[in-house]
Amino acid sequence: MSGSLDRFARPCFEGVSSNDERRERRSDFEVSEDEKKTRIGNFNFKKKAAKASSKLRHSLKKKGSSRRRSSDRTFSLTIEDIHDVEELRAVDEFRNLLVSENLLPPTLDDYHIMLRFLKARKFDIGKTKLMWSNMIKWRKDFGTDTIFEDFEFEEFDEVLKYYPHGYHGVDKEGRPVYIERLGLVDPAKLMQVTTVERFIRYHVREFEKTVNIKLPACCIAAKRHIDSSTTILDVQGVGFKNFSKPARDLIIQLQKIDNDNYPETLHRMFIINGGSGFKLVWATVKQFLDPKTVTKIHVIGNKYQNKLLEIIDASQLPDFLGGTCTCADRGGCMRSDKGPWNDPEILKMLQSGGPLCRHNSALNSFSRVSSCDKPSFSGIKASDTSTAESGSEVEEMASPKVNRELRVPKLTPVCEDIRGTAISYPTDSSEYDSPMVDKVVDVAWMAHEKPKASKGSEDTPDSGKIRTVTYIWRWLMMFFVNLFTLLISLALPQREGHSQSESSVDGPNARESRPPSPAFATIAERNVFSSVVNRLGDLEKQVETLHSKRHEMPREKEELLNTAVYRVDALEAELIATKKALHEALMRQDDLLAYIDREEDEKYHKKKKVCW
């Protein structure tokens, strides 16, 4: 076990004093809990004993009451983080492999990042290494590490009009809440104000900001490790207009980027305002998903308010979703970017640049693992103007420029000390007076929750695909494409047999005979989706061909039509002549009637004269 855990024997720095004076090093093995409390008494830590099956509670304190500049401040921070000893070993083995092949940049030397990739590939080291190497190559080709300096998204306000989305607040467990109003998305107008390439770069930039700024800020605010988010999708009004060909192409590209490079970042998802049509979508799609993945996604109708309020406090939920927040002073909830990442004190801790040390201990029935994390730091250039509103507090940590460098702590490469009945690996610790993160890892609690034999079993390849909001768009697209194809097949009897043969693939008998392999389910899903997309592409090509053709009429029909037109013209001329003759006859008749009346009057007068 010592060979696999050599990395955890690195020294841990628990603090840096103002005069940088090094204190005497002592190993955790040699120092009792009482001595530790005495040694760090100046930090005013309050450690509470916990059982092996319970989580330890931690507190965040700030040393000193006077306000000094950030370079003179000392923060002490304890973050709750539960590790599994088997996961620690797997991450260490994976890390050693990456180091040996020069595939571990300092900015990615992070326990939780590597763990997410391992979970995405079900702890298969070979597949995880391939996924990791592809991610490293993508970051280099895409320029991800310098995207904050190289790219500015000036059209953000216009994009937000036609694609309402953004983070707003945190849930009751401290995770950031991401909201999208898919029914209000207008892909045509969206592509008028930006391009696909620029939108993809904006998407990556925001994901980097979330991973490097927002999630660490949530960790500090919640005093526990957080590396995933809660998502709310409002699908009211979603229809065929949302699934044009450019929109589908964009969704597929975003989904591939998220799944390949930012795995396991979704904690739970709520799909609200889903009507009967969308429920049909969900009933179809969830057949291809792992049951544990299905438990993460909650499809709710229009009575979603109570469910959301169980997870998210009303003050953190926008009013249009049943909460009380309006963010009137920030242009509305979708523009406010509300969250702990805008808190000046938290930003000071993120920007201070001091080493945050994590002291971890993992307990199980066989050994006690004590570990200390010495995280790396990366400069992140943030352009969030909302952090510039802080008065004297922000003046200590921010320049007057909107774009500034943030020193973001990476929260976890692990150095460990194993304590057991037979062997022990003492970890030296040096004390400095600096910002510090203290973590306690209770593996027995995790072992009680799930058997170690099933580690990683809940993270199947299917669950790795349902991580981002863009995948839901893919589900919606699959449903509407299938529905459209079904209608066409019903209208064309000659293709009925072909349609039935395809639909029988997903029938109950086929599902019963399908082997219970997650890989098979993934392949089946990909085959169904690719075949549907291909058929839809063929239909679109045919429609475009019909639109591009000129509507030409055969010569014979054109001659007949011209003859008929000429005949109609002749009939109209004859009708006009007939009307004229009839009018003249009527005039003549009126003249004759008037003449007869005059003659009768004259005869009457003559007879009257004769009588007199």
From Swiss-Prot:
Domain CRAL-TRIO, first and last residues per copy: 155-329
Spans annotated as Disordered: 16-36, 379-400, 498-518
Coiled-coil features, chain-numbered ranges: 555-588
SUPFAM superfamilies, alphabetized: CRAL/TRIO domain (SSF52087), CRAL/TRIO N-terminal domain (SSF46938)
Membrane topology annotation: Peripheral membrane protein
Family statement: Belongs to the SFH family.
Protein name: Phosphatidylinositol/phosphatidylcholine transfer protein SFH5
Originating organism: Arabidopsis thaliana (Mouse-ear cress)
